[in-house]
Amino acid sequence: KAKWVEGIYKNIWIDQFRKMSKLAYNEGTLITSLFEHARELQIELGCPIEKTMVTPNGIRVENLQNIPGKTEEDEGKINIGAVLRVTPIKDVKTMIQAFGFAKEKDDRLKLWIMGPWEEDREYAEECFQLVSDMEIPDVVFTGRINIRDYLGRMDVTILTSISEGQPLTILESYAAHKPVIATDVGNCYG
């Protein structure tokens, strides 16, 4: 159903996916999904309803209670946090471009891109270069972090993924009482 997949290979891939799904559904004793809509899609693809079950992601809410808040460095800033892997599926380039436009409207904005970038170094370098080419101030790539050290400093979190299941970053943001801006993919709508 992905509209962004183009070319002659799309139908071949869909056919192979359906075959693999049927095999897994026939041989499996329990088929789990992260959220209800994914379960419905599995049933649509031929999984017997009695084999399906929703097992949502979970986090330890207590680990994100009483976390450190804003620092002196944050004075006068509106911190926007993105907790993610810097990879194409997270569409970090769109996030950077959108931030660039928003920054022109409100100079208080600061974007924190928090998470590893080593998985796809070429894409990460393209993201770094985009920030440089657009001459956007106040974009920070932290690399891998302990979420407790940063999440309390954020005013809002953002996720621009083109595909998701049930993102932990959204659950963590809610646990820390932070609002979320997210693309409408997977279970990002709640």
Q: Which ranges hold each PLM region?
A:
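Short hydrophobic beta-strand element within catalytic cores of glycosyltransferases
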Residues: P179-A182
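Membrane-proximal helix-turn-helix segments that form the acceptor-binding/catalytic region
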Residues: N11-I31
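Carbohydrate-associated surface elements
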Residues: H37, G58
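Conserved donor-binding/catalytic core segment of Leloir-type glycosyltransferases
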Residues: T32, E73-K90, I96-F99, K103, ...
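Nucleotide-activated donor-binding/catalytic signature segment of Leloir-type glycosyltransferases, i.e.
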Residues: A124-R144
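Aromatic "clamp/platform" in nucleotide-sugar-dependent glycosyltransferases that forms part
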Residues: I162
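Glycosyltransferase donor-sugar binding loop
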Residues: V83, K110-E125, F141
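Short alpha-helical donor nucleotide-sugar binding micro-motif in glycosyltransferases
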Residues: R144-I145, D149-M154
